[in-house]
Regions:
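Active-site and ligand/interface coordination hotspots across diverse enzymes
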Residues: 1-29
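Short, solvent-exposed loop/turn segments at secondary-structure junctions
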Residues: 20-21, 57-58, 112-113
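A short acidic (Asp/Glu
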Residues: 25, 62-63, 114-119, 178
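Divalent-metal-activated hydrolytic enzyme cores
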Residues: 63-70, 75-91, 97, 128-193
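Short glycine-rich phosphate-binding loop at a beta-alpha junction
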Residues: 102-108
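Short, well-ordered beta-to-alpha junction loops that form the rim of enzyme active sites
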Residues: 108-112, 170
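A glycine- and small-aliphatic-rich helix-loop capping segment at beta-alpha/alpha-beta transitions
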Residues: 120-130
Length: 193
């Protein structure tokens, strides 16, 4: 039995890596210096624990990678790589859930890897990114490949599903602050009332 098992409402957030480390965002798409501080401040004030996922794109391709679409990451080798680096995180989630914790997943809107609802798609992109030769990318209703693998692993383990799947748009937060819908959900499930 956990020492903290008498604390009501234990909750944590599984967080896309770049929300706590903007240095890993594809250049020049980072929107904050260091961290998305308004989000981090909000979730810590509301009493959530945080599991920061690794940045799959940086580990897989490094910091000098091009911007890419979901289709470019949707390969057998990237999915296997994602499973391999997620395995210890799934074990951690399993332990926390077994101890009575509930959780929320926060991804990055538009990310080909870390979106949970809306990702970037471009069937034409391959090879050198020549925007003049292809139509512009579009946003589609689909998780990014890495988050899709995460959610599949959670289901395969038979773990309790996340309370919510939320997305943060870096640029929107930089321009307007945290979206009201994200704040409402985090308030709703906050361990601190």
């Amino acid at each position: 039995m956990s020492i903290l098992s008498n604390i009501p409402g234990k909750k944590f957030i599984i967080l896309a890596h770049c929300l706590l480390n903007q240095n890993t965002v594809v250049k020049p798409l980072a929107s904050h210096v260091g961290v998305v501080s308004s989000l981090i401040q909000f979730i810590t004030e509301k009493g959530y624990g945080v599991i920061q996922l690794p940045c799959p794109e940086t580990i897989y391709l490094g910091l000098r990678r091009w911007w890419m679409s979901r289709e470019q990451y949707d390969t057998v080798s990237y999915r296997e790589f994602s499973k391999r680096i997620l395995e210890p995180y799934i074990r951690l989630v399993e332990e926390l859930v077994r101890d009575g914790c509930e959780y929320i997943v926060i991804g990055v809107k538009g990310s080909p890897s870390c979106a949970v609802r809306v990702t970037t798609s471009n069937q034409c992109w391959s090879g050198e990114p020549r925007v003049d030769k292809c139509p512009p990318p579009v946003k589609i209703s689909s998780p990014g490949v890495f988050m899709e693998v995460l959610l599949e692993m959670i289901r395969r383990k038979g773990l309790k599903e996340p309370l919510e799947l939320l997305e943060i748009d870096h640029d929107e937060v930089a321009a307007k602050g945290l979206p009201d819908d994200v704040c409402r959900v985090l308030e709703k499930y906050s361990p601190i009332k």
